[in-house]
Regions:
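A short beta-strand-loop structural module common to alpha/beta enzyme folds
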Residues: 30-42
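Short hydrophobic segments within beta-strands
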Residues: 8, 118-120, 151, 224
């Protein structure tokens, strides 16, 4: 038996981390071989050349985009293809410390007593998942941090420019994601590390910032939820994204 990860073609680094990690955990539970393509941002190489033919396989996508029946997959007498997004925090919480080692996370804290805010813009405007200026302004005001640093995929966006020029925020790095790439460039990795190692962070509804929150050692994590927005619903259904966690009692749900 074996577990094979089949990355979704539309998935970027964060989404691929979910698929890879789900496959990694499942292969450990099944005590079987694990095959996957590369995650070069974490120096994980592909080993797909040895995968061979599939045997009585089942696809995780058969359960849905996010939901999967772990017990059934573990007991399945055959191969498992991980081809869904599997974005449920409960799949990963028990393995957090092991995953920190897997992804080579350091025991580092920076930006103490500051809030680092992630703003995902670009494609989120198109898919109606962008939280918007009013949301971020209220979050910043309610959080009461004297200094706010913005990590974003588009420093030219009206929202980001307004937060910098009118509300006193500063930028961690400058730039715009113009083209889709499945792996992150050096600027994006710098932003990821800033989020992961900062003392206090407010994430966006993105897998990129979720992994930074989950793997880091934070004093405060603010999770964003917006009433009426289907992306990351505040009350998720069976096959919705459900990534809220509060492992160390440091996490806050921020809903407007």
């Amino acid at each position: 038996m074996k577990v094979i990860v089949k990355y979704d073609p539309a998935g970027r680094m964060g989404n691929r981390m979910f698929q890879y990690t789900f496959g990694y955990i499942l292969s450990k539970l099944k005590n079987c071989s694990f095959y996957h393509d590369s995650l070069p941002n974490f120096k994980i190489s592909s080993n797909l050349e040895g995968v061979g033919n599939l045997n009585n396989h089942i696809n995780t996508r058969s359960y849905g985009d996010q939901y999967a029946d772990i017990d059934m997959l573990v007991n399945h007498e055959g191969d498992v293809v991980v081809d869904s997004f599997v974005q449920k925090s409960r799949f990963y919480i028990d393995y957090r410390e092991e995953l920190k080692s897997l992804f080579k996370v350091k025991d580092t804290i920076v930006n103490k007593k500051k809030l680092v805010l992630h703003i995902r813009e670009t494609d989120y405007v198109t898919i109606n998942a962008f939280l918007g200026y009013d949301y971020y302004k209220k979050l910043i005001g309610d959080s009461k941090y004297a200094e706010v640093i913005i990590v974003t995929d588009n420093t030219k966006s009206d929202t980001v420019q307004k937060l910098v020029n009118e509300d006193g925020c500063t930028l961690s790095t400058e730039g715009t994601v113009d083209n889709f790439t499945v792996h992150s460039d050096s600027r994006a990795i710098d932003d990821f590390k800033t989020l992961m190692y900062s003392e206090n962070i407010a994430i966006s509804q993105s897998s990129f910032s979720w992994w930074a929150a989950f793997l880091g050692n934070h004093k405060k994590i603010i999770f964003p939820f917006k009433t009426g927005l289907d992306w990351w619903p505040a009350s998720p259904g069976k096959d919705d994204i459900d990534l809220y966690f509060n492992i160390d009692k440091v996490t806050q749900k921020y809903i407007i």
